[in-house]
């Protein structure tokens, strides 16, 4: 099973469609477009995090299912979605070990605890999810989404060339202890991604994260 099987499954398409209808008044998109955009960011992050093909497949499946819990309301949607995903994946014959990895990623995708980032699949889902909500997207063609473009947009927006600032701005929705987070392997890998983009476009590269004083 892969993410394409899931996003083409009538059951999942129906759930995401219902979520889009339920969330119309929120001016946010938790359904189909957000799911597809999150998948696109995750594909790029999987390369930054050096995920194996197997890990990338699990990540993209987690992306495809990460918000299905919104069908039962926003509160606790991460936990509800994780349980729904486990039932769905088990029903379709997925190995229990892989089911648990995906379930853990979905349950922790809000990124509210530093230990949510210890697992690479979970970390990539959190980052991809937050990058989509931090992007310029207002119902665009999801294929136009670009991790590189978002890094550059944030650099231009705040008129800074300090990668640490851009990391914080792009991931502002992550409610973690930044003093701890900047010491984590997830931050180190993300930092490397930003460094690559900055150097490609000749931005000076100086680390400064405002929340860490």
State the predicted function of each range.
Residues 135-213:
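Terminal helices and disordered tails flanking the catalytic cores of nucleotide-processing hydrolases
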Residues 1-76:
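Acidic/His-rich, divalent-metal-binding segments that scaffold phosphate/diphosphate chemistry
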Residues 41-44, 105, 130, 193:
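Alpha-helical scaffold segments in carbohydrate-active enzymes
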Residues 48-161:
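Divalent metal-dependent catalytic cores for phosphoryl transfer on phosphate-bearing substrates
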């Amino acid at each position: 099973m892969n993410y394409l099987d899931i996003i083409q499954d009538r059951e999942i398409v129906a759930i995401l469609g219902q979520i889009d209808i339920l969330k119309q008044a929120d001016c946010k998109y938790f359904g189909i477009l957000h799911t597809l955009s999150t998948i696109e960011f995750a594909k790029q992050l999987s390369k930054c995090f050096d995920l194996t093909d197997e890990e990338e497949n699990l990540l993209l499946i987690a992306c495809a299912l990460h918000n299905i819990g919104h069908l039962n309301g926003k509160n606790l949607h991460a936990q509800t979605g994780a349980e729904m995903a486990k039932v769905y994946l088990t029903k379709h014959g997925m190995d229990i070990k892989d089911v648990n990895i995906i379930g853990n990623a979905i349950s922790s995708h809000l990124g509210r605890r530093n230990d949510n980032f210890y697992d690479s699949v979970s970390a990539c889902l959190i980052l991809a999810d937050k990058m989509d909500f931090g992007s310029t997207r207002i119902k665009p063609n999801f294929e136009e989404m670009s991790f590189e473009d978002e890094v550059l947009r944030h650099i231009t927006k705040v008129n800074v060339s300090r990668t640490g600032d851009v990391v914080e701005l792009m991931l502002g929705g992550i409610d973690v202890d930044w003093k701890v987070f900047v010491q984590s392997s997830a931050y180190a890998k993300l930092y490397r991604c930003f460094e690559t983009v900055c150097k490609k476009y000749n931005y000076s590269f100086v680390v400064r994260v405002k929340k860490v004083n």
